[in-house]
Amino acid sequence: MGQHGAIRLQNEVQEGMPPPHELTEEEQWAEEHRKMHEKHKGHEAMHMEMMVIFMISVIVGQIFLVTWKRKHFKSYQMCTLIGMLTIPVYVCFNRSWYRFLATWLVFCIFSAFIWLKASAQHISGGTPRFVYKWFLFLHKLSYVLGVVGYLIMMGALLGFHVLFGVSQPTLMDAGILFMFYGVYYGVLGRDFAHICTARMASRIGYYTPEGLPKKHLEDGVCAVCGGRLDDSEHVHDADAVVTTKMVEDEDEKLYKLSCGHVFHEFCIRGWVVVGKLQTCPYCKERVDLQRMFKNPWEKPHLFYGKLLDWIRYLVCWQPLIVTAVQGLTTWMGLE
């Protein structure tokens, strides 16, 4: 009798208990992590084989990419651009990240418009400066987004999230989001700028990849855009900025390179900083960037450009290498 009463009391307590609460995102991640450890327990040797395969694949892939870029740069550049445009879009579409897809669509529409202007048979005098200003704006915008994202991430790590009343993972995700948008569109902008730069300069006629201009550059003409320079302006030294003057109703400086050729500010900045062409647009002489950009606040843009070149490998080629390694390990029966 007592045992039956005890059993009835236990059932009543269980029926009166509240239902289990839904797991939070952190708890779900911890549970999945625990299950994965239980599943792969005792597979240390297999995991070591997979790590060796991955390291060898990364090294071989890096050597292949460097050789490909050195031997056939145009095909490497085009394949990289296609990968940069398609791989993140495929991932975001599968995960229903429509905010990125909307920004990607807007970027592609503007880039297509710029490409059409740069590829026209007859390029107007203001088109080159407009194109370079657009890509220089993208470069600076990506730089600002990257810095803001980095500062937000550092604030999350230092505990500043309590000042905004948000959780640390939320603030960290916001920082990563800003940084991703900055570096991704910065890389795409530099690739588009490099393609448009060479194509537009070849249309104007003062530049060819072989270094033999199609027509002679007259004095007082910018070799990038073909626009006139003010002959009355006075050059102070070989690498100094010429006195500010009005160029098409805008205050714009002139730059004179060590080779003696003078260019509009936005033209040479777009050519060197954004277009990644560190040579004179006319005579192919190498440009000394340290002497050209003397102000300390200008040099981070150059370092950021080099960082974007490295990010290109992580965004485009690293996912392909990881996918290939996963396919190889699955074919070999490794888990």
Swiss-Prot record:
What are its E.C. numbers? 2.3.2.27
Primary place of residence?
Answer: endoplasmic reticulum
Q: Which residues lie on this side of the membrane: Cytoplasmic?
A: 1-47, 94-99, 165-168
**So where does this one cross the membrane?**
48-68, 73-93, 100-120, 144-164, 169-189
For this entry, list what GO says about its biological process: ERAD pathway; inductive cell migration; PERK-mediated unfolded protein response; protein ubiquitination
Enzyme type, top EC level: transferase
Start and end residues, zinc fingers (RING-type) = 222-284
Q: Give a brief account of the tissues where this protein occurs.
A: Expressed in body wall muscles, the hypodermis, seam cells, vulval cells, spermathecal cells, uterine cells and the distal tip cell (at protein level).
What keywords are assigned to this protein?
Endoplasmic reticulum, Golgi apparatus, Membrane, Metal-binding, Transferase, Transmembrane, Transmembrane helix, Zinc, Zinc-finger
Where would you find this protein in the cell?
A: Endoplasmic reticulum membrane; Golgi apparatus membrane
How does this chain sit within the bilayer? Multi-pass membrane protein
Phenotype upon knockout is: RNAi-mediated knockdown in combination with tunicamycin treatment, which is an inhibitor of N-glycosylation, results in increased expression of hsp-4 in the intestine indicating endoplasmic reticulum stress and activation of the unfolded protein response.
Keyword Iron-sulfur assigned: no
InterPro entries assigned to the protein according to its UniProt record, in alphabetical order: RNF121/RNF175, Znf_RING, Znf_RING/FYVE/PHD
Known catalytic reactions: S-ubiquitinyl-[E2 ubiquitin-conjugating enzyme]-L-cysteine + [acceptor protein]-L-lysine = [E2 ubiquitin-conjugating enzyme]-L-cysteine + N(6)-ubiquitinyl-[acceptor protein]-L-lysine
UniProt GO cellular component terms: endoplasmic reticulum membrane; Golgi membrane; sarcoplasmic reticulum membrane
Lumenal topological domain residue ranges: 69-72, 121-143, 190-335
Pathway(s) of this molecule: Protein modification; protein ubiquitination
Gene Ontology MF term list: ubiquitin protein ligase activity; zinc ion binding
**What PANTHER family has UniProt attached to this entry?**
FI05221P, RNF121 PROTEIN
Q: Which family does it belong to?
A: Belongs to the RNF121 family.
- Functional description taken from the UniProt entry: E3 ubiquitin ligase which accepts ubiquitin and transfers it to substrates such as the beta-integrin subunit pat-3, promoting their degradation by the endoplasmic reticulum-associated degradation (ERAD) pathway which is a pathway involved in ubiquitin-dependent degradation of misfolded endoplasmic reticulum proteins. Negatively regulates the unfolded protein response to reduce endoplasmic reticulum stress. Required for the cessation of distal tip cell migration at the end of larval morphogenesis. Plays a role in germline and gonad development.
What is the protein named? E3 ubiquitin ligase rnf-121
Source species, please?
Answer: Caenorhabditis elegans
